[in-house]
């Protein structure tokens, strides 16, 4: 589902409907969401009703409609809403669509004015985290979703647990903290302003907290 359940009244709160059926709930691991409508705060609503169930973010796309090749337009917003925003609302995993897509660049570096998708029978407006040049099937171009994944995976290791954070807050700062299985800590921070910010982690806790 999308966060707003596509505005279909009989689908609103769909996970709750399943979880409220004790027999059906036994066979459901959790709920999965896309971000093409609504607000990610719905993740917290679902978690609070069924904290024992998994939450997984399973799809978001970039393309011609949202400046998908322009990192200045998409990287920070993608990292905040997908990379950190979902995790801070109890998602245990995040995937994006699609990891790699073939694109006809017509000899040009991809931009919103060139290098348009060319996939008969497929999405004609979508870019992948990585675009593969169809002319040589070798040249690749990395987009915002690729760099979002790279930033996170550079410090957050498989099996890491998100830990609670508290202290000074700033409207221009978004962050999430983790403890890796080897005992090391990871701290992912987004600075949405054009000014430098000084942030000093001083202590750690295993308490999980949600986004506010």
Segments (PLM) and residue ranges:
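A structural motif corresponding to the C-terminal end of an alpha-helix
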Residues: 24-27, 86-91, 152
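Conserved small/polar residues in nucleotide/adenosyl-binding loops
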Residues: 205-212
């Amino acid at each position: 589902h999308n966060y707003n359940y596509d505005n279909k009244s009989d689908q609103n709160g769909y996970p709750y409907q399943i979880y409220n059926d004790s027999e059906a709930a036994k066979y459901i691991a959790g709920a999965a969401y896309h971000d093409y409508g609504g607000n990610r705060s719905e993740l917290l609503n679902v978690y609070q009703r069924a904290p024992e169930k998994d939450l997984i973010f399973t799809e978001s796309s970039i393309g011609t409609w949202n400046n998908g090749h322009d990192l200045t337009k998409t990287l920070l917003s993608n990292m905040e809403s997908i990379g950190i925003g979902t995790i801070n609302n109890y998602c245990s995993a995040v995937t994006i669509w699609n990891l790699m897509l073939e694109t006809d660049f017509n000899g040009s570096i991809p931009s919103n004015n060139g290098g348009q998708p060319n996939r008969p029978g497929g999405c004609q407006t979508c870019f992948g985290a990585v675009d593969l040049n169809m002319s040589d099937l070798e040249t690749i171009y990395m987009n915002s979703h690729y760099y979002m994944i790279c930033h996170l995976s550079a410090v957050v290791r498989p099996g890491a647990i998100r830990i609670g954070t508290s202290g000074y807050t700033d409207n221009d700062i978004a962050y999430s903290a983790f403890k890796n299985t080897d005992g090391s800590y990871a701290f992912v921070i987004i600075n949405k302003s054009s000014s430098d910010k000084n942030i000093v982690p001083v202590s750690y806790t295993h308490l999980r907290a949600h986004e506010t």
